[in-house]
């Protein structure tokens, strides 16, 4: 009876595309009988997939795929339908009016792209009383650091964070992700909803809501763990899409 050996490999950071490509190269050099991958960047890995096809190695995408035509299969949640359901549930919690901010894990993965696009379309088409006022992507921190630092140095934004108080000049790289998130909430005093495209983005948005003490903001997002299950039970999160 033949035995199947499964090797698990992955980048230390889920959005580290270069690391994932390097790991993929290493695994292909071992000529596995098959390859399963959750693709961090929908536009990456095509060269590696071509090499796999040339070597007769079938590739199956899990959770987050790509438009590469040579994939044998993609196994994932219906990201479009589930994001639309999340939008409808959040709109219901918001009583069909108010402002929303999207927190997304990245700009590159297919799952994040589809979830964000479907959520936006559902809100725009079917919930006209709701406006999406911002979208924060966790792989775009540096751009936001530039924006926040520029406003602070111009005197148009004064954070409550004591660590930043009294500084004449703030460098972008000095700002933490939490401070950037606090800026987003401060800039949107009429915010009524937060949508998170995965558990990391969801937790980031929820933490911002709680630091700002904005109990009027409804929170809906993807994935569940012990912490999010507790938050749902306590009413700190209003809805979870569980895969």
Predicted ranges, named:
Residues 1-243:
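A residue-level marker of the well-folded mature domains of exported/periplasmic proteins
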């Amino acid at each position: 009876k033949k035995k199947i050996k499964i090797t698990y490999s992955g980048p230390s950071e889920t959005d580290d595309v270069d690391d994932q490509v390097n790991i993929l190269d290493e695994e292909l050099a071992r000529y596995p009988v098959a390859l399963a991958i959750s693709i961090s960047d929908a536009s990456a890995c095509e060269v590696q997939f071509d090499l796999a096809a040339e070597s007769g190695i079938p590739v199956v995408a899990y959770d987050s795929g790509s438009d590469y035509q040579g994939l044998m299969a993609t196994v994932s949640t219906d990201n479009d339908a589930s994001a639309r359901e999340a939008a409808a549930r959040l709109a219901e919690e918001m009583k069909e009016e108010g402002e929303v901010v999207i927190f997304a894990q990245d700009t590159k993965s297919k799952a994040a792209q589809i979830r964000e696009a479907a959520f936006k379309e559902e809100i725009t088409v079917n919930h006209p009383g709701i406006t999406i006022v911002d979208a924060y992507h966790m792989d775009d921190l540096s751009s936001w650091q530039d924006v926040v630092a520029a406003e602070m140095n111009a005197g148009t934004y004064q954070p409550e964070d004591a660590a930043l108080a009294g500084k004449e000049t703030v460098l972008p790289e000095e700002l933490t992700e939490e401070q950037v998130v606090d800026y987003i909430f401060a800039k949107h005093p009429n915010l009524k909803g937060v949508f998170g495209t995965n558990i990391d983005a969801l937790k980031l948005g929820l933490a911002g809501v709680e630091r700002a003490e904005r109990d009027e903001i409804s929170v809906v997002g993807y994935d569940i763990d012990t912490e999010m299950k507790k938050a749902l039970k306590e009413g700190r999160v209003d809805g979870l899409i569980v895969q």
